[in-house]
C-alpha cells in the first residue's frame, strides 16, 4: 500500500502564493518511491496548482458541499472540485466540526457526494482532551467514524486527528497514533470486510520532518495529514526524504 502524504494548507496561500509554492517545489521535487503526495488547498488555489504542480502530484479541496447543486450560497460542490482538476477532498476536519458544528451525518453526506463525483474523500475523526482524559478515546473515535462513514463506499481515506494534542501543550506519540489507527482498522474491517485492507489510515497531529518516519513506520499508519509543515517547500521535501 502506498503511503499518502496529504498536505493541508488550511486557510493559507493566495493563488499567487500557491503558484510560487508549486513552482519552487517543481525545481526541487523528486518522487519518493512508495509515497503519494496530495496538496489540499483553498478552492481559489486549485487552478494555480493545476497549472504548476509537478506531474504525479495530486491536489484537492478542504471541504465540499453535502448537496449536488442548487440554492446553497457560498458552497462548493463535488462536481466543481472535480472539474477544477481535484482528485480528493477533506471532509469532517476537526476545525470544521468545531467551528461549523458539522455532525457525523453531514460529514457522511459530504463523503457520499465526493464519491458520487469521482473524488476520494479523506474523512477525519478524533477526540478532544476531555474524552482522552476520561479514557474514552477509542470508543468515542470509533462512534464518530461509524457515523461519518454511513452509506460511504470503501474508496475512502481515514485521517485520525488527536484534537486533544492540538494547542493544549499535550504531545501525542507514535504509539498514540498506532493505538487509534489499529482500532480504526478494526472498525473498517467490520464495515467493509476484505476491502478494508486497501483503505489508508492517516495520522494528523503536528507531523513534521523530525517525526514522520517514526509515525508512518507503525503497522496501521499509512500516511499523514500535515498542517503547518505543509506550507514551506523545504519542510515538505524533508518529510519526503524521511519517508524514502
Curated annotation (Swiss-Prot):
Its EC number is 5.3.1.1. Pathway: Carbohydrate biosynthesis; gluconeogenesis; Carbohydrate degradation; glycolysis; D-glyceraldehyde 3-phosphate from glycerone phosphate: step 1/1. It catalyses: D-glyceraldehyde 3-phosphate = dihydroxyacetone phosphate. One of its GO terms (molecular function) is triose-phosphate isomerase activity. Pfam families: TIM. The active site is at 93 (electrophile), 161 (proton acceptor). Keywords: Cytoplasm, Gluconeogenesis, Glycolysis, Isomerase. It is an enzyme of class 5 (isomerase). GO terms for biological process: gluconeogenesis; glyceraldehyde-3-phosphate biosynthetic process; glycerol catabolic process; glycolytic process. GO terms for cellular component: cytosol. Substrate binds at residues 8-10, 167, 206, 227-228. Its main location: cytoplasm. It is found in: Cytoplasm. Belongs to the triosephosphate isomerase family. Involved in the gluconeogenesis. Catalyzes stereospecifically the conversion of dihydroxyacetone phosphate (DHAP) to D-glyceraldehyde-3-phosphate (G3P). Homodimer. This is Triosephosphate isomerase. The lineage of its organism: Bacteria, Thermotogati, Deinococcota, Deinococci, Deinococcales.
